[in-house]
Amino acid sequence: MAQITNFFLGANSGSGFQNLFSEIMDPETAFDIMILKGGPGVGKNTFMREIGRTMEQAGADVEYLWCSGDPDSLDGVVIPMLRCAVCDGTSPHAVEPKYPAAVDRYVDLGRFYDLPAAKAQAVEVKRHTHDYQDAYGRAYHCLKAARQVELDTVAEVSRSFDCQRAARRFSGIMARELRGRGSGTGKITRRFLGSLTHRGPVWRFDSVEALCPKVYELEDSYEQAGPLLAALCGEATRRDYDVTACPSTEEPGRLEHLLIPELGVAFVTSKPGMVYPGKPYRRVRLDALSHPENKARLRFRARMTGVLREEGIAALQEAKAAHDLLEGVYNPYVDFEGVRAQAALEAGRLLSWMK
């Protein structure tokens, strides 16, 4: 039975749009990467769903990569066994071929627009485009303000965090879980586990459980787990275990979750707004290792951060509504049968490579 996993390549944050699209698949080892071009409402999601559905039915594992602007829409699909992928290559993702045709290639869905009809809608298209771009600007202003308040809290808590005690605890975990050598090459695949969206925070912990039945839950409200997870990641890859490293959506250089599928072990961060819903194998209470002095001030900052993030989410909802209107303008003038036929052609090509 095909194994299905779900992640994100993009995320909304206090620093704007965070982008891992260049890491969808390493072009040095990939066989085929389709980069979809075409504007709003042209059927990129339809195309990718068709590819994913066909490969699932053929028994291949499929990784779905969801959109932070609309977590019900796809930004990409990966077929690991074929070393193949397809992704949305339009703004803000801006994916371009590195080895054109030999490895990665464009698939132009823009040709399925009815050009004269679309040009007749230019006024509406421009209005809705400006509306959703303005809404994203407001969202990122609010999220930036929320992040600044949050960083003050993190800095204050960090001063009282018992780093040595945390390191000892993780050293014991590392000794128990990382034994022997893996069968991989120590490859690191980076994915966001979720994102802040117009529906609020969306986290795909289902993928953690699909890949790793043993889960260590790290209670970490103040961003102290990053160096500990980095050490685990380094030791795992040194021992040739392939890992999926899920960075923070606010700081992609800092790890929040680490999955080691060959061992069936995962380490996930749990905090307000990102609570692990399952039953962990073990819970590591990092919050208990810090002793900030002014807890009332921390609670006030937490409320302020929450209010500002809610304003950001409201703006993301406005952006989603404006983008839906924009797609609604285009949809009547898209040849969706042509899009599906192109998807079927490409899916057939993928199936031929399975033989």
Each language-model region and where it sits:
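N-terminal pre-Walker A segment at the start of P-loop NTPase domains
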Residues: 1-25, 164, 171-207
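Conserved nucleotide-sensing/catalytic segment adjacent to the nucleotide-binding pocket
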Residues: 2-18, 32, 53-117, 124, ...
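Glycine-rich phosphate-binding P-loop
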Residues: 33-52, 199-236
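A cross-family "folded-core" feature that marks the main globular domain of proteins
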Residues: 36-37, 47, 55, 63-66, ...
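Rhodanese-like catalytic fold shared by cysteine-dependent sulfurtransferases
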Residues: 73, 89, 173-180, 184, ...
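An accessory alpha-helical subdomain
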Residues: 124-177, 297-300, 304-343
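GST-like fold's C-terminal all-alpha helical module
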Residues: 348-355
